Amino acid sequence: MGTLVWTDDYTEPFDFRVQTYQGHPVLTFWSGELLDGYGHGSYYILNQSYVEIAHFSPVGFENLGDIHEFTITSDNTALVPIYHAVTADLTSVGGANDGWIFDCTFQEIDIETGKMLFQWNASDHVGVNETYNDVKNVGTENAPFDYFHINAISKDANGDYLVSARVMDAVYKISGKDGKIIWRLNGKQSDFDVEDAAKFAFQHDARWVDNSKQTRMTIFDNGPTDTIGYSRGLLLAVDQDKMTVRLLQDFANAAKTFAQFEGSLQPIDASNESTNYMLGFGSQQFFAELDKDGNILLDVQFSKSNTVNSYRAYKLPWQGKPLTKPDIHYDMNATTAYFSWNGATDVEKWIVYTANATNSSTWTNVTSARRTGFETTIDLSDIKLNTYVRGKAVNSAGGVLGWTKAGDGIKLFDAPDDVQENSLSSSSASSSSSSSSSMRSTSTAAPTSSSATAAAPSSSATGAAARNIAWSGWREQVYVAAVVVVGGLAAA
């Protein structure tokens, strides 16, 4: 399936991915309290060393930022949504005239200064009667009616916004000048002639593929529609002159999975019309990679059913350079050493050293092994060892990345990194990998159900949980996905 690269204990992370901020790759995500189909929290940016370089909330809504979107624009601004209760007349949908709705607001914020540059409220522009949601027993102050459900926001090259509203079955183009709706695509009041094959329902992750020309759009169609009973990714041709929409290609996995909520479709290289596509199934434990014609290249189930969900799935390059030291657990009784380095992506090999004193200026190289996963296990049973054992992480060119502390089988001790090295043997030890969630006590904590997690593809899949159809040329890539346990069904 894949091996862990990095994990941390941020609470209930959502929309976890690699983006660009101020010209550098960064990790971004939301963290906070996950509620019934929305959330209250804030937004984080980490640099390549996993250091938090920005943390903010929507302006005027401290710690009330929603889970569904955190996009950084080319202007180093952030697009973020807010769900907040306001009064509304619900008689058009069978509710009270003094009812309550979740107003879906989004803001564009200058990340560096914290200044709000733009704000848009759904209730100012979209009527309650456009919704496909049922008011049922909600519509009160304690249980507002979720009539719009914003779940994707992006900004095009002209300064206008593309907004997805799940329970409207519609995508909106919003003027960046005055907030007026330029057009509606799909839904009850569509301004487009949408061919039947291109119609969608309860969608997520609407994006322009070509942000300048705005002729192709991707959408994750949760469904079901009148003709399709499973979830799929859609590549649509959008003609804003003729006001027509047609299907260029749809994308589905082999199981024809239905994801009730969440999901994503990512063109891996949006500048290339022949690019592959990454398809994530949100509330279901599947992701897939497909070629431009919808042929499945990779089809994976990464967990048991109804245990975890990954809001969106991405395939993105990432180079992690942690400031922490690598970790070692040395089991003296089993004469086994375990090596890991949370977040490091460039480790090619672990070299094992031994000495009789932690402050020794000379350490003896006794063996080495290629990194085989998040945690690499090295058998030292046939090697004569001194009192202390430690490891050195090196990259593919042999460059030193970092040294672990020294262990005596009981405790870990500080030891100098600037040392002389003696060589005992040129042989390499046998090793095995472990990405288990039960990490050794001296290692950085493994992923939990509420961790932000980056995972890298491995060269093999495990058991029936993964269906590896074509796994070639992936060694340089890193998957980035947020894995979050949901205690119950929520329309996220």
Where are these regions (language model features)?
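Histidine-/acidic-rich catalytic cores in large beta-rich domains
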Residues: 1-424
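Extended, compositionally biased low-complexity polar/Lys-Gly-rich tracts
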Residues: 44-47, 277-280, 439-442, 446, ...
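Ser/Thr-centric signal marking residues that sit
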Residues: 372, 376, 404, 444, ...
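Fungal extracellular serine/threonine-rich, low-complexity, intrinsically disordered "mucin-like" regions
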Residues: 413-461
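Cleavable C-terminal sorting propeptides in eukaryotic secreted/cell-surface proteins
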Residues: 458-492
